[in-house]
Amino acid sequence: MLRIVVDTNVVVSALLKPQSNPALTLSLFIQGDCTVCLSKEIFTEYEEVLARDRFKGLDEAEVKKLLSIFTRRALWVVPKVLIYDVAKEPADNAFLECALEAKADFLITGNIHHFPVKEFHHTHIVTPSEFLNLMIQLMIK
């Protein structure tokens, strides 16, 4: 099963726009078609960002439900290698650390420009749209 790491912006976008590519990406995880890989640092970022005032309009029950699904069904890892200088935003290095430890196939982000490389130790860095297109191609084969 494909292993994916999901950037916080994808989670937020999925909750804001339930018919969007980020939402479709998360639905693949929820349906069991891929495995989301998480570290404590990433999950904490999810919680902190979703608790911000500007996201108070989100359906609180949906937020709790999604976080609960992550808690129960994700592949949890503790990164052994710390990365300091790959992503343009220092906080984004946590996603690379998780991907490296989990041997993830994809890191999915809406902020592709934060990652100056398209691949990091065999993890492909893609947008939700690119990921969905790749999944469609895999299903056709």
Model-assigned labels for residue ranges:
Residues 7-8, 38-39, 111, 127-128:
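A secondary-structure boundary/capping signal
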Residues 1-19:
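Metal-dependent nucleic-acid phosphoesterase active-site entry motif
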Residues 86, 100, 105, 112-141:
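Acidic, PIN/NYN-like endoribonuclease modules and their adjacent C-terminal/linker elements
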Residues 72-112:
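Active-site neighborhoods of divalent-metal-dependent phosphate/nucleic-acid chemistry enzymes
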Residues 6, 22-51:
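PIN/NYN-family metal-dependent endoribonuclease catalytic core
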